[in-house]
Amino acid sequence: MDLSLAPTTTTSSDQEQDRDQELTSNIGASSSSGPSGNNNNLPMMMIPPPEKEHMFDKVVTPSDVGKLNRLVIPKQHAERYFPLDSSNNQNGTLLNFQDRNGKMWRFRYSYWNSSQSYVMTKGWSRFVKEKKLDAGDIVSFQRGIGDESERSKLYIDWRHRPDMSLVQAHQFGNFGFNFNFPTTSQYSNRFHPLPEYNSVPIHRGLNIGNHQRSYYNTQRQEFVGYGYGNLAGRCYYTGSPLDHRNIVGSEPLVIDSVPVVPGRLTPVMLPPLPPPPSTAGKRLRLFGVNMECGNDYNQQEESWLVPRGEIGASSSSSSALRLNLSTDHDDDNDDGDDGDDDQFAKKGKSSLSLNFNP
């Protein structure tokens, strides 16, 4: 393989470079002129670019563009595309490359025993300065396609690394990220589906009206979450104002019952009362209230008649309550209720005893 060798003297290399530049200019001049020699009336004839075979790319490192003035070629690529003669390994050889603009570049290519690497030294620093290469840029090496003479032609190209800030600005700019919330009139008809789950508004306090509304009102539920909007069914409408009634403190939950005393059992904690017995019993008028008592009421072991007062928790859990009603005047006939009331009011001899027997 012919690698365009040149003498190592500076004068001869400069002369060859000038000759290559003149040859390039002559080719451009001949291509710009037409068959008649008048290029004013005829369009410019463009020579198609030569066919090239890509060899390898090299991402330049800070040391490649630093003060060392050398470019390290990977060993596998150097031995494959730029083999060196062992007899001339010490001085190296000169390689000619043509860039995209048609300018010829000549680099000294050699092998360093100290670092055991293949490097390009002479002429590389001028290439870096002219192309303004920086760490991260890519240098591409190519060669011609065709016969042996075409394959001996070497080409060099370069491209700068992309500016990541501009790339990110271009990518994210297409999405139109902004923090301006849309107006209600413009986006009032646009809705987005919410996930399939039942959301319960979050309150600092519980209100029995709001609590029941949040569970049983299926037409419209207030949803408090990230952003602004109202929940109607399972659709979340954007642009709607937030209902601030859901985030303010509401009245606490109050149940109308007897206050709970520690160590005591209240009627609220007892089982529900069963319906009254249907058997006909004895009628008794007490404090102006008609009361009916079964015939075997006193003989029942358990009774669900619970007074509104407080009952000992220990006694109520192990035994039933027994209510004994006794009067000094037993009116078995129960003929006149009004007479009993008058007699009770005048004499005051009637008595009521409540015995809670364990």
Swiss-Prot record:
Q: Which PROSITE patterns match?
A: B3 (PS50863)
Q: Where is the composition biased (Acidic residues)?
A: 329-342
Q: Which UniProt keywords apply?
A: DNA-binding, Nucleus, Transcription, Transcription regulation
Q: What is its main location?
A: nucleus
Write one Gene Ontology MF term.
DNA binding
Region Disordered: what ranges?
1-45, 310-358
Q: Which Gene3D superfamilies match?
A: DNA-binding pseudobarrel domain
**Biased-composition ranges for Low complexity?**
25-45
Q: Which InterPro entries match?
A: B3_DNA-bd, DNA-bd_pseudobarrel_sf, LEC2-like
- Give the UniProt subcellular location, in the record's own words: Nucleus
**Function of the protein:** Regulates lateral organ growth. Functionally redundant with NGA1, NGA2 and NGA4.
Q: What is this protein called?
A: B3 domain-containing transcription factor NGA3
Q: Supply the gene name.
A: NGA3
